[in-house]
Amino acid sequence: MCIRDRVAAALKLRDPQGKYTTVVNLQGDLPTIDPLAIQRCLAGLTNETVDIATIATRIEAETDVSNPNVVKTIAPLGEGREVAYIRDFVRSPGPEHDAPFWRHINVYAYRREALDRFASLPVSTREAIRKLEQLRALDNDLRMAVVRVDSLPLSVSAPVDLEAARMMLRKKS
């Protein structure tokens, strides 16, 4: 069961009447995320044709472009464009992908119907190969938008990251 499936199950449990029409999936491993980034993610649903919105920031370091642990969002952002439809998610861009590259930040805003549909779908072939569950949505014609943000939150995945996050949060308070 992927995180989207768990979010959908929790929403059904907490809101069986369907009162809430949108939901944000913000995971606890991003404690330093800028609240404005969350607002921008939600704003990605302003266009009625968008089913799911997420956020990305421009990749500056060449080592991040080649790092398969940094998921890249393939979308025509930049040149004054703040929101775009997502074409693909990749771990290692190929020659068919043009720079600049955008680092995906694992925050999502869903329309409830889209989340329910997404959670009911089987794992897609590309999702299984690339180990990127967001490809299940793209492979099943759910429209995803990405909103550009300027800051990259610290992702906490090791004890050293936790200490760095604590230091950052102390400085803010």
Predicted segments — roles?
Residues P31-I33, P153:
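A short, conserved beta-strand element in the Rossmann-like catalytic core
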Residues A99-S173:
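Conserved alpha/beta core of the MobA/IspD/sugar-nucleotide pyrophosphorylase nucleotidyltransferase superfamily
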Residues R6-A9, A37-R40, A164:
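Alpha-helical elements of Rossmann-like donor-binding domains used by nucleotide-donor carbohydrate transfer enzymes
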